């Protein structure tokens, strides 16, 4: 591999803000925030809206996931 062209692959905490669920994995995603994990170390934190803990396919519960107000934007745009 060429040096200096690959992103840093490191441990990152992903936090599902809707389900209050966090998990530690490895990723190259950039993060601005950090969080102290259960092992006492600081890790970059990435907040996500949907994970396996909140997605209807995995939970078996049907619910509307409209965190960005998409329905309201559509209604305003088309006068509904």
Swiss-Prot record:
Subunit: Part of the 50S ribosomal subunit.
PROSITE patterns assigned: RIBOSOMAL_L31 (PS01143)
Sorted UniProt keywords: Ribonucleoprotein, Ribosomal protein
Gene Ontology MF terms in the entry: structural constituent of ribosome
UniProt protein name: Large ribosomal subunit protein bL31B
Superkingdom of the organism of origin: Bacteria
GO terms, biological process: translation
Pfam families: Ribosomal_L31
Membership in a protein family: Belongs to the bacterial ribosomal protein bL31 family. Type B subfamily.
One Gene Ontology CC term in the entry: ribosome
């Amino acid at each position: 591999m060429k040096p200096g062209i690959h992103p840093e692959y490191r441990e990152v905490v992903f936090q599902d803000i809707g389900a209050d669920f966090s998990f530690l994995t490895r990723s190259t995603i950039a993060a601005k925030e950090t969080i102290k994990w259960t092992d006492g170390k600081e890790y970059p934190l990435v907040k996500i809206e949907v994970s396996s803990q909140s997605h209807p396919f995995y939970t078996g519960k049907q619910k509307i996931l409209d965190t960005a107000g998409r329905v309201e934007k559509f209604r305003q745009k088309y006068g509904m």
